């Protein structure tokens, strides 16, 4: 199981939002590439990055920062936020991104996912309040069901689902283990969990999660790392221990 340390970029800064609220932002640094390099040096096998400005507007104004991360680190980079067209995805791939995460556009235009999946690594990012999927930087609820949407992409050729429980994001109060178990039971596509991780025990609960013989591909952690609840190296060790037991 892989750790995906998170770098959320807004106005060129490394930030975290609380429950996806743009008015509840904490700034942790002004150099995303430096932060990514620090994560990689501690043993992160991937970096997860979100362009918060693009998630809201679709304008990839942080593309230069993302390209700088890709150039700086020697590990794969997974990036989401505002990927709503073929050209937007291609700009990220051209910038050195390994895997693009399509969220709002996947929900509103599923054919885009099917068009892009043969061209490069694509993950579908599904962000939900409970089972109600939200889009446009989490600011609009769609009324679409999380599990029905996951099932609808079963034959789309995607590399992964990135599933975020918005109510837990940035809270450090623990992941939605039961909900994630249901996700695992719904799809054979690899699943990356996001939202709520605040302790090493939370990570252990995810390592031990299994449904229909499937386990999580990875977990995204952000605030817990920035608030020094644990280090990247500690988290990687816990996830590796779990994989070996």
Model-inferred region functions:
Residues 41, 48-95:
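N-terminal active-site wall of soluble small-molecule enzyme domains
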Residues 111-117, 122, 207-218, 224-245:
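C-terminal helical cap(s) of enzyme catalytic domains, especially alpha/beta-barrels
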Residues 8, 39, 47, 79, ...:
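Conserved, mostly hydrophobic/aromatic
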Residues 2-6, 46, 74-78, 98-101, ...:
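Structural preference for beta-strand elements that scaffold enzyme active sites
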Residues 72-99, 111, 178-215, 230-235:
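Catalytic cores of alpha/beta
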Residues 46-62, 104, 163-172:
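Glycine-rich, proline-tolerant flexible connector loops at the mouths of alpha/beta enzymes
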Residues 15, 19-23, 97-169:
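Conserved anion-binding
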Residues 60-67, 139-148, 173-182:
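Charged helix-capping and loop-helix junction motifs
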């Amino acid at each position: 199981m892989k750790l995906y340390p998170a770098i959320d970029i807004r106005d060129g800064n490394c930030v975290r939002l609380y429950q996806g609220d743009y008015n509840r932002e904490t700034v942790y640094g002004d150099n995303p590439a430096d932060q990514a390099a620090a994560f990689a040096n501690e043993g992160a096998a991937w970096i997860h990055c979100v362009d918060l400005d693009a998630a809201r507007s679709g304008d990839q104004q942080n593309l230069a920062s993302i390209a700088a991360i890709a150039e700086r680190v020697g590990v794969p980079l997974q990036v989401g936020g505002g990927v709503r067209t073929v050209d937007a995805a291609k700009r990220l791939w051209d910038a050195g991104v390994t895997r693009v995460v399509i969220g709002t556009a996947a929900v509103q235009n599923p054919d885009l996912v099917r068009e892009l999946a043969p061209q490069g690594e694509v993950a579908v990012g599904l962000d939900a309040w409970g089972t109600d999927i939200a889009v446009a930087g989490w600011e609009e609820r769609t009324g679409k069901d999380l599990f029905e949407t996951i099932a609808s992409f079963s034959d789309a050729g995607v590399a992964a689902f990135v599933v975020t429980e918005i109510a837990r994001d940035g809270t450090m109060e623990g992941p939605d283990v039961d909900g994630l178990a249901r996700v695992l039971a719904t799809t054979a596509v690899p699943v990356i969990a996001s939202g709520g991780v605040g302790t090493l025990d939370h990570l252990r609960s995810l390592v031990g999660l299994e449904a229909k013989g499937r386990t999580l591909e990875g977990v995204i952690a952000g605030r817990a790392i920035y608030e020094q609840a644990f280090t990247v190296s500690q988290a990687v060790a816990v996830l590796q221990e779990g994989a070996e037991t």
